[in-house]
Amino acid sequence: MQRLKIKRCILSQKEPKVAYDCSMAKKRRAEEQALGVPVNKRKSLLMKPRHYSPDMDCKENPDNRNEDDGLETNDHSTADEIVVKPMDKTLHLPAQESSLPKEDQYACYPELMVKSLMHLGKFEESESVQTVGENLNGNGIQSLKAECDEANECFMVHSDDGRDKVHHSQPPFCSSGDSESDSDNTENGWGSGSNSSEDTDTHKGPKRKLTYNRKDLLEVPEIKAEDDKFIPCENRCDSDTSGRDPQNSHMEPLAVKVQPSFPEVEESESLATVIAESAEVEKAKGSLSLLEQAIALQAERGSVFHHTYKELDRFLLDHLARQRRQPKVTDASGRQIFNNKHSPRPERREAKCPIPGCDGTGHVTGLYPHHRSLSGCPHKVRVPLEILAMHENVLKCPTPGCTGRGHVNSNRNTHRSLSGCPIAAAEKLAMTQDKSQLDSSQTGQGPEQAHRVNLVKQIEFNFRSQAITSPRASASKEQEKFGKVPFDYASFDAQVFGKRPLLQTGQGQKAPPFPESKHFSNPVKFSNGLPSAGAHTQSTVRASSYGHGQYSEDTHIAAAAAILNLSTRCREATDILSNKPQSLRAKGAEIEVDENGTLDLSMKKNRILDKSIPPTSSHTTIATPSSSPFKASSLLVNAAFYQALCDQEGWNVPINYSKSHGKTEEEKEKDPVNSLENLEEKKFAGEASIPSPKPKLHTRDLKKELITCPTPGCDGSGHVTGNYASHRSVSGCPLADKTLKSLMAANSQELKCPTPGCDGSGHVTGNYASHRSLSGCPRARKGGIKMTPTKEEKEDSELRCPVIGCDGQGHISGKYTSHRTASGCPLAAKRQKENPLNGTPLSWKLNKQELPHCPLPGCNGLGHVNNVFVTHRSLSGCPLNAQAIKKVKVSEELMTIKLKATGGIEGDEEIRHLDEEIKELNESNLKIEADMMKLQTQITSMESNLKTIEEENKLIEQSNESLLKELAGLSQALISSLADIQLPQMGPINEQNFEAYVNTLTDMYSNLERDYSPECKALLESIKQAVKGIHV
């Protein structure tokens, strides 16, 4: 009983107002319950939820007390963190300080039970004996009665006090002075009321004493809780076990109140109650320990799960945030890198396309996303001419005399700076050679080395006059080096634009052995023009004792002037030769050159008479050091050659390069080398020369002379791909344009497959990608469909090819299957190849009207050099002119052999064989085409027949459908009319027996000759009458 009062005092912690309301309510319900039947309190307490919280009774209705689950206490603080404060102060819990109010509801009950009953076992024996002794003294009956009333009040308050109470904070503990008011504790729903008004003064003594003992009980846990805040689970389980003793003690006072109030019976029952309590406490300890262990295990498991899920949620949120940030960072960094990479430099950010309305996007070639000039603008076609001209003037190459064509790396057709200019590269190379030659000339040159270099330079002279030292071991290299002299663009600029390069005379040279020889300088002024062909003399110096400064460059100047002035056929006389130096002047008409480098090739020239001064001796030499050196494409053609051509022929007669006119009878020899030397030895009026020994030319030099670049004005340097330093064909020439390449391809037409309609692709064996003859053609021996001529060609006979033996097939360019003129005829091209240099006109040309054409034999006028005109009618723009000039130096046999080697055909038999095969293919194709035409006519006739049959079938089907519909109508009418008439041995007429009915009727009417009975005749008459109404 004393434990019940101790617990009731500990748990009665409410505010004064709430405690007062609860005490009044308990007193009122206790009086009402005194007349009623008591309820088993043990059973009602056992029905509480496992984690029942007394605060729920104060906050919620009794119906909602069991809604919350006890598992939610996993995340809340346990009873180990409870701190017990003095009785007059507020008891603060760690869970109460948190922001979750639900945690107090689940944690208050077990925490208070554990802390309040923790040390109950220490005072259990002493207090229980003292309480029993006091209760059994003279006033034992009244004390038991008071305790029973208090128990009833406690029970009644427990059942209904949740409706009148409100959630509150932890109230202070009760003091000894407040024991008579007995304020309630709403956390566990048990109320304890004071019955001081009913008890006497003797009853108050034990209560005060008990209150004093309760104060001692509360002070001891306070000290222990401050020292040790973490209480073991065993003490908590023991305290909970002892905390359930008051529950068992409530049963006995209720039973005592019903029995007769005799002192002896009450004393015996109180002793039994104390004994029963001690037994039940031991049983409750075991169950409570198991319960608390399960609660602790569940709390730990819940905390682990809660922590795990919390960490998982945090990880997922971080991962999602990183994924969202990563694309943004990548995009931003990518944009920054792209902008840094492709953004123009600070000084070029203002550069943009000059075309109005263009933002610079869309480069023509697609290599760049933007453009900043007219070169790559896709809207360049729609640009006004003023803007185009203004920008084109700015975008020209700064090198004088350069048109911008012939870019070095071949990625572009033109260039606008010195970086890709071949002329600038040649000038730079020439300057380096000048420096190296100047350094080498200072060291001196031996007589043997000078002799060897002079021998090499007999074919072509270098325009520099200084000496070149070379060791004896590298003699063959020197011969290869000087065998083909590169074209000097700087000298061309000097001739055209008046630039005078510095001349350096070699030192250490020996004096000439002829004292009479005088060196004439050639101070010709080339401000706006080029020297004429007749204003120069040839240099016949061949002796090894002469220095390089004594060699004349007039032959090269004359060749260049002749190439540039071929269309005018200028024939200028040689200038007056004076004894004084610097008296040789070119007084002929000069070629005018405008600021853009365009030459004036008009035919109006002033012819000046020759005024020659006899030389001082027969051995006088005219050696003109080149004040303005000039060479053209390694051609060795002197002024005498052109003068002979001009003197022997008129202005309007085309030049025939197949025969050399300047030779005398003594100089006609079979050796091509001697013929070349004889050309140089030919003497004309106004020239002074000396006989000199002629050393033999090497065969190696002769071969190298044959394989030079055929492009006019190209020295072979500056290969397109950069893999080679020089080239000897048009394929790698940076100065060759597309028209020249197409012309060369047209002239070498034998390298294409002769099969009509075949482009050369698809070799039979697969070893080669293309073929040039019928041997590997997959279409040669197949009976495929031939590209037949169109109907217009069959109708118009005038539009056929004029070449005899040609059927109009096999166009040269491959774009058309047939041709109607001789321009694309492959047979005409073959016949031109057979006789390239004979002046005889072809047979098919006789039928056509004579038109102005190129005077060079074998040239069809296509492929102008500067690409201004599609065709040319003079030698000025002929790309084959340079080749023809070079071929004059060799015999006709070498030329024919070279043509046959390039064409790939060694004899005429193969050509005839190919022609026969082509004719056979044409015949087979014609037969196949005739068969195909027959088949097509048969197919068309069969198709027309099928169409007529189908139309007839459609008509028949329509008629059948109409007849069926009519038959159905007649049958229905017959059935309706004969419905009342019934034949013997047959049922009434219907759709099932309609056919049998009709058959019997037809038999009856067909056999009318028989003698029927009167009944049958009457039936037939009735049938006739019924059928009369049907109209067919």
Curated annotation (Swiss-Prot):
The keyword Cell inner membrane does not apply. GO terms for biological process: interleukin-1-mediated signaling pathway; interleukin-6-mediated signaling pathway; negative regulation of cell population proliferation; negative regulation of transcription by RNA polymerase II; positive regulation of transcription by RNA polymerase II; regulation of transcription by RNA polymerase II; tumor necrosis factor-mediated signaling pathway. It is found in: Nucleus. Zn(2+) 6 binds at residues 854, 859, 872, 878. Residues 29-76, 162-213, 325-354 are annotated as: Disordered. Zn(2+) 2 binds at residues 397, 402, 415, 421. Zn(2+) 1 binds at residues 353, 358, 371, 377. Zn(2+) 5 binds at residues 801, 806, 819, 825. Zn(2+) 3 binds at residues 709, 714, 727, 733. Its main location: nucleus. PROSITE patterns: ZF_CCHHC. GO terms for cellular component: nucleus; protein-DNA complex. The keyword Zinc-finger applies. Zn(2+) 4 binds at residues 753, 758, 771, 777. Keywords: Coiled coil, DNA-binding, Metal-binding, Nucleus, Repeat, Repressor, Transcription, Transcription regulation, Zinc, Zinc-finger. Residues 905-974 form a coiled coil. Detected in brain. Residues 40-51 have a biased composition (Basic residues). Belongs to the MYT1 family. This is Suppression of tumorigenicity 18 protein. It comes from Rattus norvegicus (Rat).
